[in-house]
UniProtKB/Swiss-Prot annotation:
(6S)-5,6,7,8-tetrahydrofolate binds at residues 109-112. It comes from Methylobacillus flagellatus (strain ATCC 51484 / DSM 6875 / VKM B-1610 / KT). It comes from the Bacteria. GO terms for cellular component: cytosol. This is Methionyl-tRNA formyltransferase. Attaches a formyl group to the free amino group of methionyl-tRNA(fMet). The formyl group appears to play a dual role in the initiator identity of N-formylmethionyl-tRNA by promoting its recognition by IF2 and preventing the misappropriation of this tRNA by the elongation apparatus. The keyword Protein biosynthesis applies. NCBIfam families: fmt. The keyword Hydrolase does not apply. Belongs to the Fmt family.
């Protein structure tokens, strides 16, 4: 089949790679314009653009899909399907109606739970036991299309947003390829409408959410730390400096909220209930360090405090 692929970040790379390596033809890639990045703020191509260039696939990088010239270019492809993965631009109904067999999205949650911008992080924060990927029809409403395929991934106490992201991207690639193969064979895909009574929304992360409140339970703080790794990274003050906390686990024990109880095996800090064992942390201008290495250069003692 002739497929147009719309995606931008790392999450969208495995599915594009799978389609490139398949019998399908990716005739055009849509991705967001290059953005300034790094200290020099040089324009940087999206990961999807880099992969498309590597394989010589034609690219479009419009600021909007409402532009008539852009729509004419997409229509000229006479594509069988449009595949979407974390593209980041609204796709107008006129574009959705162009492909012969429709438009299909890779969404990183088990819909209808966690529609929206940050499904991976919200699943972790909420303490969900599993997450997954839904292959769905694209409709004008946000993540509201009928569901075609779903794949699940358990959430463990060691998972971060990054580990889940990577696992879900691979599952999404596998499921989307299955869907496109079936679409080519049968000319249609069976789809199940979402149960609107079960819908929850995954609001975009706000940097203010990354501040650690030591009055919360250790389980909740562990999920916060892991959900905000690699962005925006949970943090607290330590001796007047902002300390970023990259990895932490909840353990049993008691101490005043924010007070260091022990530094013998990780840095154990009191919470509203239980202790948070900080395993990896970072001071301004420094590297991410395991707790043992951090303590070698930044001695801490029981009774020292995190937070104001």
């Amino acid at each position: 089949m002739k497929i147009i692929y719309a995606g931008t970040p790392d999450f969208a790379v495995p599915a594009l790679r799978a389609l490139i390596q398949s019998s399908h033809e990716v005739s055009l890639v849509l991705t967001q314009p290059d953005r300034p990045a790094g200290r020099g703020l040089k324009l940087k191509p999206s990961p999807v653009k880099s992969l498309a260039l590597e394989h010589g696939i034609p690219l479009l990088q419009p600021e909007t899909l409402k532009d008539e010239a852009v729509q004419a270019r997409i229509a000229a492809e006479h594509a069988d399907a449009l595949v979407v993965a974390a593209y980041g631009l609204i796709i107008p109904a006129t574009v959705l109606s162009m492909p012969r067999y429709g438009c299909y999205n890779i969404h990183a949650s088990l819909l209808p739970r966690w529609r929206g911008a940050a499904p991976i992080q919200r699943a972790l924060l909420a303490g969900d036991k599993e997450t997954g990927v839904t292959i769905m029809e694209v409709v004008p409403a946000l993540d509201a299309g009928a569901m075609i395929l779903r794949g699940t991934l358990p959430i463990t106490e060691h998972d971060t947003a990054q580990t889940l992201h990577d696992g879900l991207a691979e599952i999404g690639a596998e499921l989307m390829l299955q869907a496109m193969d079936k679409l080519e064979r049968e000319g249609r895909l069976e789809a199940e409408p979402q149960d609107e009574s079960l819908v929850t929304y995954a609001q975009k992360l706000q940097k203010a959410e990354a501040v650690i409140d030591w009055r919360k339970n250790a389980d909740e703080l562990s999920r916060q730390v892991r959900a905000f790794n690699p962005f925006p990274v949970a943090h607290s003050t330590l001796k007047g400096e902002t300390c970023r906390i990259w990895m932490a686990q909840a353990v049993s024990g008691t101490a005043e909220p924010g007070m260091i109880a022990s530094v013998d095996n990780g840095i154990l800090v009191g919470c509203g209930r239980g202790l948070l064992r900080i395993d990896e942390l970072q001071l301004p201008g420094g590297k991410r360090l395991q707790a043992k290495d951090f303590l070698a250069g930044n001695p801490l003692c029981p009774g020292d405090r995190f937070g104001s």
